[in-house]
């Protein structure tokens, strides 16, 4: 039988999850902003470091570089397919109650990023030679 307690618990669990994820997003957005102020040589390197932390700001930074469009596209593909450390921490937070290995997840995210970048590079090369 569905009671108000079950509904209340479901609502509170949903809010708790959303607040937790929002906290990670805010934390890594702030960390990415700090990383953008590090004395790194060039906007491109800064964009890659920011993208490693948090993909949205990383892609935005890389898009403003003077890199060729193909390199910007490859960088964005790598960032999106990896998901950033922010995404990994969000996933780890959600999997904390399970007995899942975050290490395995990270390995597969890295593999996903490598494969996506390689396939994208092959596609870019193919399209540039048409």
Could you describe each region identified by the protein language model?
Residues 1-2, 101:
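Secondary-structure junction/capping motif
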Residues 3-76:
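Transmembrane helical segments that form the transport core of multi-pass membrane transport proteins
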Residues 69-130:
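C-terminal transmembrane helix pair
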């Amino acid at each position: 039988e569905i009671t108000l307690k079950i509904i209340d618990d479901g609502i509170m669990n949903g809010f708790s999850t959303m607040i937790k994820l929002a906290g990670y997003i805010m934390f890594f957005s702030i960390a990415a902003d700090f990383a953008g102020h590090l004395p790194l040589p060039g906007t491109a390197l800064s964009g890659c470091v920011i993208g490693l932390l948090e993909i949205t700001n990383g892609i935005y930074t890389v898009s403003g570089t003077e890199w060729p469009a193909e390199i910007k596209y490859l960088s964005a593909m790598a960032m999106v397919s990896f998901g950033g450390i922010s995404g990994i921490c969000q996933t780890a937070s959600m999997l904390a109650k399970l007995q899942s290995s975050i290490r395995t997840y990270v390995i597969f995210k890295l593999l996903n990023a490598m494969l996506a970048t390689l396939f994208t590079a092959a596609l870019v090369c193919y399209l540039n030679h048409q």
